[in-house]
Amino acid sequence: MCWEMRPQLGTTRRAIWRSWPVLCSHHKLPTSPHSANKVAMATASLPPPEKRNKKKKKDTVIVISGPTGAGKSRLALEVARRLSGEIISADSVQVYRGLDIGSAKPSAAEMSLVPHHLIDILDTTEDYSAGSFFRDARRVTEDVLDRGSVPIVAGGTGLYLRWYMYGKPDVPQSSMDTTSAVYSELLSFRESGQWEEAVKLVARAGDPKALDLSVNNWNRLSRRLEIIRSSGSPPSAYALPYNSFHEQHDAEPTEATTDGKCEASKLDYDFFCIFLASPRIELYRAIDLRCEEMLVDTGGLLSEASWLLDIGLHPHINSATRAIGYKQAMEYLLYCRQNGGESTPQEFLQFLAKFQSTSRNFAKRQLTWFRNERIYQWVDASQPFEPVVQFICNVYHDRDARAVPESLEMKRESCIHKTQDLKTYRSVNRVFCGDDSCSHILDWIRRTQRK
């Protein structure tokens, strides 16, 4: 089912449509020459009949997404370079200053090639939400279009992209009384570390999806309970203005759920959305290697995690410290600090394995999420780079050529099948292959983590 959009999200001077005056046939024409002249001039100023009701063409926004490690940043950079575009980051971690390696932030050299936005805009002590991204990204999109450039939104944070295109859901705001009451209701659970009991309370109150929250995400749990206490309904009752995730997943295939045309016709921009994907085993291998590469340099992820601890932050207390990689690295370094800066090779490799596993699981969730976002066209990231870039550029110039060439297409179902191979998947490290390979990391820990 298609939902009607609320008032246009990005309305500016480009989006305003002024209708032409229409002269009704039953009105008598003035008889004076002066008046007749006016009518003739007004009639002459009308556009041809076939153009009078033609809507203004929407501005095009390119969206490039994909699971972690798929190569979306590289693709967005090259497309932006060729189309004179500007990149709007849709990454929930790249917004933070100082979190460079763990967020795979573009280098200074890469950012000098084309303008980048929503990178390094916050301190690590600040929280950032889908609502914040919606506000900021929409503003930047208007600015980019006003400059005559092409907005290219790139990132893998699915909720950010969903809100960006479809708008914010009409979730009720909590009153101060409700917020205070919920805080008191959950306080004893929080102080005693009874996360599971708190989740069960919220589930019993009417939100079983609370069971899916990541452990100790108290902010989101509190917000879910606030919505229930304020409205009597769970957050899922406040659907976004398009087919919800489960409606799309469970419904019989229709034109709307097959190609997203029903939803796209309601949107205020002409979104051309690409999702980069590759065979799951290849993706997992790439993710495992990427995790190793983030740790091989002592000035990399571990150094950034150490800095977060030094400024008084702890794992999982805000958006920055909940981020994959940083959370695991902070927990590992806290353990090392408690042991006087000592760690065995086995402990380091266990931390690495946990980092890799969490990253792969996140990629799996991304694939599941985007498989049900029908506005995206899936492209095989394992194919040669140049044809993919050329396809996107061609589509931008010719909106009728949006079908992905068969040679580049990745079937959504191909990321579901071959489950037997995935069940037997095992990480094979290519950098940290034995005890000696991590000796420089352990030396660095010994020097810097004696706190």
Question: Which stretches of residues belong to each language-model region?
Answer:
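Tryptophan (W) side chains
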Residues: 3, 17-20
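Catalytic core of IPPT-family isopentenyl/dimethylallyl transferases
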Residues: 10, 20-84, 248-451
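N-terminal phosphate/diphosphate-binding loop that engages ATP/GTP or pyrophosphate donors
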Residues: 52-59, 73-154, 158-197
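Residue-level signal for inorganic ion chemistry
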Residues: 91, 119, 156, 224, ...
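ATP-dependent small-molecule kinase phosphotransfer cores
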Residues: 100, 107-146, 187-239, 306-307, ...
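Long, charge-dense, solvent-exposed interaction surfaces that engage phosphate-rich ligands
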Residues: 158-293, 302, 306-314
